[in-house]
Amino acid sequence: METQLSNGPTCNNTANGPTTVNNNCSSPVDSGNTEDSKTNLIDNYLPQNMTQEELKSLFGSIGEIESCKLVRDKITGQSLGYGFVNYIDPKDAEKAINTLNGLRLQTKTIKVSYARPSSASIRDANLYVSGLPKTMTQKELEQLFSQYGRIITSRILVDQVTGISRGVGFIRFDKRIEAEEAIKGLNGQKPPGATEPITVKFANNPSQKTNQAILSQLYQSPNRRYPGPLAQQAQRFRLDNLLNMAYGVKRFSPMTIDGMTSLAGINIPGHPGTGWCIFVYNLAPDADESILWQMFGPFGAVTNVKVIRDFNTNKCKGFGFVTMTNYDEAAMAIASLNGYRLGDRVLQVSFKTNKTHKA
């Protein structure tokens, strides 16, 4: 779904990963009227449960604050793990950096630095990376991408139960041009330890603002159903827990979905050897790849998406395909999204078979 990201925190790189990665970040507030503002601070790696009041109280202990903003997800309201504090006196801002930078709060080591003014060169520099080797560490991910520019934050998504990598990561560069170079250099390449090429793409697409309302509905709509053989009384999951594992987001509708044991041992023809191919039917004419990336991303590593378009009109013909690397994640995505109402259409989602529509 990882993912429509807006520009996030701008700080020096640290070994401590970001507190969260999300598809619908608010853009950072402007750091002031001048490029050399010495009163506005950006505060990174804040504890996930820290409130704006607590942020204000912490920094207010240093000096008088003009404004304070904890940046939250536009859809869920969840903290994105960073914020901005603007002091009245530049000396207080300097003191806050000297006092609070490196402070250990819960499991996080916060980073406090001067904020930069917002500009086109530093916006939209977030990358979504899929197909990573499960053994790759966050440090190795940064080493792979650091040759293209300064990395602001990085993260590899892991299963919170097993701690095993989900094969998906995010890299936020200092500048968009650096992210563009990383895409040119690494997309479709095999990093050390990988058996398949990785996919590197922008995690955000500013032109897809019209999709946010639809995707918000996907996250929050209580109108869900789970037809077909998946609806067995097997191990039960909660959709909000699933997405919490993927992105740390908890404010999803508490719909239950049934487990995958009913699919165990079944020989499904949707596996071509390079991933599990999923057929998505009844898409709207204006549907594009962005919708599919953002719908399926939180369930696991997505290596490819394709919307089938009419040759003459370039409009979606009503169906598309998604390829995921892991069977369990693909099956969970099908269980969650089959029968989902997207806009005024009910989606049909299944493993691709020999009888499935052809491109």
From Swiss-Prot:
An MF annotation (GO) of this entry: RNA binding
Disulfide bond entries: none
SUPFAM superfamilies registered for this protein in UniProt: RNA-binding domain, RBD
Keywords: Phosphoprotein, Repeat, RNA-binding
Source domain of life: Eukaryota
Matching SMART domains: RRM
Pfam families from the UniProt entry: RRM_1
Gene Ontology CC annotation, any one: cerebellar granule cell to Purkinje cell synapse
Residues with Phosphoserine modification: 221
Annotated RRM domain residues: 39-117, 125-205, 276-354
GO biological process: cellular response to leukemia inhibitory factor; regulation of synapse assembly
InterPro entries from the UniProt entry: ELAD_HU_SF, HuB_RRM2, HuB_RRM3, Hud_Sxl_RNA, Nucleotide-bd_a/b_plait_sf, RBD_domain_sf, RRM_dom
Disordered: annotated span: 1-39
Assembly and interaction partners: Interacts with IGF2BP1. Interacts with MAP1B light chain LC1.
Function noted in UniProt: RNA-binding protein that binds to the 3' untranslated region (3'UTR) of target mRNAs. Seems to recognize a GAAA motif. Can bind to its own 3'UTR, the FOS 3'UTR and the ID 3'UTR.
Family per similarity comment: Belongs to the RRM elav family.
Protein name per its UniProtKB record: ELAV-like protein 2
